[in-house]
Each structure stands twice: as structure tokens, then as C-alpha cells.
UniProtKB/Swiss-Prot annotation:
Presence of the UniProt keyword tRNA-binding in the record: no
Superkingdom of origin organism: Bacteria
Example GO BP: DNA recombination
Function field: Involved in DNA repair and RecF pathway recombination.
Protein name per its UniProtKB record: DNA repair protein RecO
Keyword flag Mitochondrion: no
Family membership: Belongs to the RecO family.
Gene source species: Geotalea uraniireducens (strain Rf4) (Geobacter uraniireducens)
Amino acid sequence: MQNIQCEAIVLGVMDYGEADKIVTLFTLEHGKLKGLARSAKKSRKRFGGALEPFARLRLHLAMKVGLSTLNGADIVTIFPHIRQDLVKIGHAAYACELVERLVPEAEQNHRLFRLLAAYLDHLDQFQHDPSDRRFFEANLLKVVGYQPALSRCAACDADLAGALVLRWSPSSAGVLCGRCGKTGRPIASQTVALLNRAMDTGRFGLIRFSPTELEEAGELLNAAISCHLSRPLKSLAFLREIGV
């Protein structure tokens, strides 16, 4: 057992027995891990309000394979403005659940940690914009290695630059040329260009989709994400319930 300190974002929390909690964390230094917080339900002195979903923490833990032990936590930020807005809460929960479901345990990924932290920070500071969700999804897929083919045909590898007709299908790994995607769903070249720009741009708030582009990008990204999930996302159902 190794005693360490690390920076982490809380992905999820569940009760364990009468007094304890099991916390799923995404850490900068060690990737995703689960930690047991003893007596977290009975006493707030040890952890205060730190063990809340999508809080950013500095952790003290005894690390071991399977289930680590949380010995203490210092709050970096709880993203207070997110917690005052139901739509922002839904999107923060969605981002954290995506990371939890798509990332294996104990696999360090600095880029993904920074992406998630940047999205939560942007949600906290600015009014929610649907384009930011698509920006996060596109970059998440890129960082974890599930990026859909956007510049070349996913079927024949033809260069899509200047193509007049572009399509995609849920069974494809990206966008198809006119010859390969005769029965696929149409997608505008401008939508594809914006998705490519989103993955080349390092900051939230710089890419904005029109309503039509949002719909097209959303359909493609949702399909690209869904094929890597074994069951539906609870947070996505919540977003639909609140009309987002």
C-alpha cells in the first residue's frame, strides 16, 4: 500500500454500509480509481463537503489495486456556480459519467484530465451553450482514441476535402464519401469542418454550431459514443428529462 497525494475530480459517489462511501475519482497522476472513504457519512470533519460529484480535490490516499483508502481531501474547487443551475449540473454529471464509462482504471491520461477540468471550469464561469457539449464530446473521443474519421472516408479512405456529398451511418466509424455512403445520413461539409476545428482548438467557447449543425454533429457524436457503451447513460436520461 502506497501513501500518496494526487489531484482528482470526483466522478461519482455511492454509499457503502452504514457509515462509509465509495468514491470514483479521475486523478491527474494515476487515472481512474476507486477509494473507500471511511465514516464519511457519519462525520463531516474528516472530508467536509469534499466528496461531492465533480468536485476538484487534492487527495491524501493509501493507494492499492482495486480499492484505495481515502485519508483526507482538500478542496480545490466545488464549481459553485454549476451547483446553482440544473442544466449545468446535468452537463457536468454527463461529462463525468462519460469519463467514468469510457476510461479503464489506472490508466493515466493527463490530456483527458485537463479536458474535463477545463469543461467544468467553463461551465462554472459562463452561461451554458450547447456547442460546448459537442466540443467536449469531440475532444473526449479524440483523447481516448475513439475519434471518428472526419477528413477521410471511413470506408475507402478517400480524401473528403472538397466533397460535395457527405454521409454517415451509425455502423460506420465516421463520415463516408458519396460513393460509400449512398444509404447513409447526410451531413453538411461545414458541420464536419467545425468538428475538425473543435478537435484542433484548445479552448472552450471558440467553436459555435448553428442549430442545424448542432443537430447533425450531435447525431454523429452520440452514435460514436454509444457504440462504446454497454448500457445507456443515466445522466443523458436526466438531460432529456429537463428538456436539454
